[in-house]
């Protein structure tokens, strides 16, 4: 089944190779008229899902395993406002035995200004046992092929 991909390959901000576009909606803003700090996490989730879609890597959940968030850090560089078009870059920076660390960067498209950077570590967990499990080789192989020499293991 083919699904519409909402991201794209990009070489505009190495080492990132993939990005997804999103627009700031009014509901994303706070009383100061800028993007509420917590709204950036869904933007990065969106880009990560599209990254996986591009690599034909649906979730691992078919096997009763899921990636769960272990750590998330966000740094705010400049405010985004209602109706700004943002390009959210994402990459896998590191893959461990059972964890994957993603890096992200959000740029305003109009002037290519850096808005936010993020690092998120997810752990593959057996949902029944509630314990971490090794990341499958097929998953690692796809990431290695896409990220090439930019992936830490």
Go through each PLM region and give its residues:
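HotDog/MaoC-like acyl-thioester-processing domains
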Residues: 2-20, 76-82, 93-153
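Catalytic strand-loop segment that frames the active site of acyl-thioester-processing enzymes
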Residues: 2-57
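A broad, structural micro-motif
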Residues: 35, 67-69, 115
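Residue-level recognition of specific faces of alpha-helices
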Residues: 40-43, 68, 121
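Short beta-edge strand/loop motif at the mouth of beta-sheet-based domains
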Residues: 54-55, 60-66
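Helix-adjacent hinge/juxtasegments
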Residues: 63-95
């Amino acid at each position: 089944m083919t699904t519409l991909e909402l991201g794209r390959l990009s070489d505009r901000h190495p080492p990132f190779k993939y990005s997804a576009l999103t627009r700031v909606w009014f509901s994303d803003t706070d009383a100061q008229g800028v993007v509420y700090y917590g709204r950036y996490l869904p933007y990065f989730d969106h880009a990560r899902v599209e990254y996986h879609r591009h690599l034909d890597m649906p979730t691992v959940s078919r096997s009763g395993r899921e990636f769960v968030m272990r750590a998330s850090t966000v740094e705010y560089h400049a405010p985004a406002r209602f109706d700004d078009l943002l390009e959210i870059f994402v990459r896998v920076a590191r893959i461990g035995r059972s964890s994957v660390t993603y890096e992200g960067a959000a740029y305003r498209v109009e002037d290519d200004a850096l808005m936010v950077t993020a690092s998120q570590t997810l752990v593959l967990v057996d949902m029944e046992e509630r314990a971490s499990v090794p990341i499958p080789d097929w998953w690692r192989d796809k990431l290695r092929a896409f990220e090439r020499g930019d992936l830490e293991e």
